Amino acid sequence: MANVRTHKGITPQFGERTWVDDSAVVIGDVQMGEDCSVWPMTVIRGDMHKIRIGDRCSIQDGSVLHITHASDYNPGGWPLILGDDVTVGHKALLHGCTIGSRVLVGMGCTVMDGAVVEDEVIIGAGTLVPPGKRLESGYLYVGSPCKQARALSDKEKTFFKYTAA
């Protein structure tokens, strides 16, 4: 596949039943779990650090997933890690961050370097999660920069596996 590219001798790896649209590009040190989907015009670029994506994740149209390279400012760099049952909404940007399991990243969100999103979180559309910020499990976050808005309902918590499937 021309849209799956080896970089520095490392070729992306995909679990069973994972689908990548022909217009999406996956480059380098990327490992995706089973039953994932990567939708049109998405870029997943593991060029200077690793990207790990769990099972049953949906990476929607136009999203950009990238790492943070090592530098004097950040000697180790930051990988990009996604847990299981994660939905990344249309045109989201995830950069060198860690996303737990059962998370909805809303459309147009930006999650920056070193941020950590715990399990069972909803990040509202257009939200900015600044560098190094930690989002506590069980809450909705909104705004730029993000703020904790309210606790998630039990119904919302059951919705994660549906949206990612």
Where are these regions (language model features)?
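Extended, small-residue-rich solenoid/repeat segments and analogous flexible loops
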Residues: 1-35
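Glycine-rich hexapeptide-repeat left-handed beta-helix
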Residues: 1-14, 41, 47-84, 90-165
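Thr-Gly-centered strand-to-loop micro-motif
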Residues: 21, 46-47
